[in-house]
Each structure stands twice: as structure tokens, then as C-alpha cells.
Swiss-Prot record:
Keywords from the named record: Ribonucleoprotein, Ribosomal protein
Name this polypeptide is given: Large ribosomal subunit protein bL31B
Keyword Ribosomal protein: yes
Gene name linked to the record: rpmE2
GO biological process: translation
Annotated region described as Disordered, given as residue ranges: 81-108
GO MF terms held by the record: structural constituent of ribosome
Organism: Chlamydia caviae (strain ATCC VR-813 / DSM 19441 / 03DC25 / GPIC) (Chlamydophila caviae)
Keyword Ribonucleoprotein: yes
Gene3D superfamilies attached to this UniProt entry: Ribosomal protein L31
PROSITE patterns: RIBOSOMAL_L31
Comp. bias intervals (Basic residues): 97-108
NCBIfam families: L31, PRK01678.1
Gene Ontology cellular-component terms listed: ribonucleoprotein complex; ribosome
InterPro entries xrefs: Ribosomal_bL28/bL31-like_sf, Ribosomal_bL31, Ribosomal_bL31_B, Ribosomal_bL31_sf
Length: 108
């Protein structure tokens, strides 16, 4: 088996950028930035959403805007015109189709 094919698994400090909540978890994430947490120095990874800020875990009803996706949607469709009703074509009378003929039999 080849050696050094997998990245190193170390403890990493994850910081929720919206609440400041910090927790240490094992990961293969590598970073040049480090922070001291509970007396030890860890590589740090900043996350935008964690269990301390996500509405599912906090029970709040606020909307999580993922990098402006909601604003982008509203901007795109707020100026859209409402759909026009489709008008049925005027009926001139019943349309009669001709009878289909059975396919001719092939001779052997």
C-alpha cells in the first residue's frame, strides 16, 4: 500500500463567524491560521453556519440567507409581469378526421 496518500487527521478549532461559538473537532482541514483555545493551539476554520446559529437547532424562525440567494431571487422575479390568461381559439365547427385505412398485407 502507498504511504502518505491520505491527509493527516488532526484536531481543528471551528469558529461560527455569526455567533462566535467555538468547538474542537477532528478533521483533515489544513489552515495556516491558528488560535489558542482552552490552553492549546489549533488550526482554525471559520464557518458561516453551525448548530449554534442555524434556525433548526436554535428554534428561531429567522430565514438563513445563503450568500444572497433570496435577494437574488427577489430581484430577478419582482419585476416580472403576471402571466396573461390563455384565450381559447374561436370554434368554427366540429373537426372531422378521415378514417384510417388498415395497412396492406404483405404477400409472401
Amino acid at each position: 500500500m502507498k504511504k502518505n496518500t491520505h491527509p493527516e487527521y488532526n484536531k481543528v478549532l471551528f469558529v461560527d463567524s455569526s455567533t462566535g461559538y467555538k468547538f474542537v473537532c477532528g478533521s483533515t482541514y489544513q489552515s495556516d491560521k491558528t488560535e489558542v483555545y482552552e490552553g492549546q493551539e489549533y488550526p482554525v476554520c471559520y464557518v458561516s453556519v453551525s448548530s449554534s446559529s442555524h434556525p433548526f437547532f436554535t428554534g428561531s424562525k429567522r430565514l438563513v440567507d445563503a450568500e444572497g440567494r433570496v435577494d437574488k431571487f427577489l430581484k430577478r422575479y419582482s419585476n416580472a409581469k403576471p402571466a396573461q390568461p390563455v384565450q381559447a381559439p374561436a370554434e368554427e365547427g366540429p373537426v372531422v378526421k378521415g378514417k384510417k385505412k388498415a395497412p396492406a398485407k404483405k404477400k409472401k
